[in-house]
Amino acid sequence: MDKQQLETTVTKVLDEMRERPIPLGISNRHIHLCAEDYDRLFPNHPISEKKELLQPGQYAADQTVTLVGPKGQLKNVRLLGPLRSTSQVEISRTDARTLGIAAPLRMSGSIEGTPGVRLISPFAELDLASGVIVAQRHIHMSPLDALILRVSHGDKVSVAINGDERRLIFDNVAVRVSPDMRLEMHIDTDEANAAGADNPQAFATLVSPR
């Protein structure tokens, strides 16, 4: 095989890899807790794993809480582990209306100036001063994935969600690159319902960098 044939073959393989389906993760409402807040809500009860998640080292815990806002409450909101340095609550726009909380659209971890909420566990209550957000839709990927897809950490891209009979394109999808991440797009339940993505065959494909 000469150089030109090799380059043609490599280009074809890379193009096929760029068109491969991106696994879709639908994020239901959930919480992340720091160690101090966890110990207050679940004293003498070590965090326990219920289900492993796709991202390495992350899991859904057995522990759940009730969120209480000015207008309503949401029960059985699952804790995701492991514990973090700062507590955070991720909900959908629909959830925010149910609670009566003006949760801003933010990237995970960006909680400055965000509203709080009351957390109730089977053992205690805690008034979280801040940390309630609607999570910005995003794609997790490794540096190799980013190289293949021609994107960088912090980029905004357009992604097509291929669900049932509907196909919906989401703009402003944030790219998050880390050696510890696996390729997966995260959307919330409102976005999943709009795209008809509530079936196991649903997947995402990159449309174009923005």
Swiss-Prot record:
GO terms for cellular component: bacterial microcompartment. Keywords: Acyltransferase, Bacterial microcompartment, Metal-binding, Transferase, Zinc. CoA binds at I26, S27, N28, K71, R78, N193. PANTHER family: PHOSPHATE PROPANOYLTRANSFERASE. It is found in: Bacterial microcompartment. It is an enzyme of class 2 (transferase). Zn(2+) 2 binds at H138, H140, H186. Pfam families: PTAC. Zn(2+) 1 binds at H30, H32, E90. Formed by 2 beta-barrels, each is capped on both ends by short alpha-helices. Involved in 1,2-propanediol (1,2-PD) utilization within the bacterial microcompartment (BMC) dedicated to 1,2-PD degradation by catalyzing the conversion of propanoyl-CoA to propanoyl-phosphate. Required for optimal growth on 1,2-PD. CoA is regenerated within the BMC (for use by PduP) via this enzyme, although there must also be cofactor transport across the BMC. Directly targeted to the BMC. Expression of a cosmid containing the full 21-gene pdu operon in E.coli allows E.coli to grow on 1,2-propanediol (1,2-PD) with the appearance of bacterial microcompartments (BMC) in its cytoplasm. There are 2 Zn(2+) ions per monomer; Zn(2+) and CoA bind inbetween the 2 domains in each monomer. One of its GO terms (biological process) is propanediol catabolic process. It comes from Citrobacter freundii. Its EC number is 2.3.1.222. It catalyses: propanoyl-CoA + phosphate = propanoyl phosphate + CoA. Belongs to the PduL family. Pathway: Polyol metabolism; 1,2-propanediol degradation. The keyword Acyltransferase applies. Its cofactor is Zn(2+). One of its GO terms (molecular function) is metal ion binding. Phosphate binds at R84. This is Phosphate propanoyltransferase.
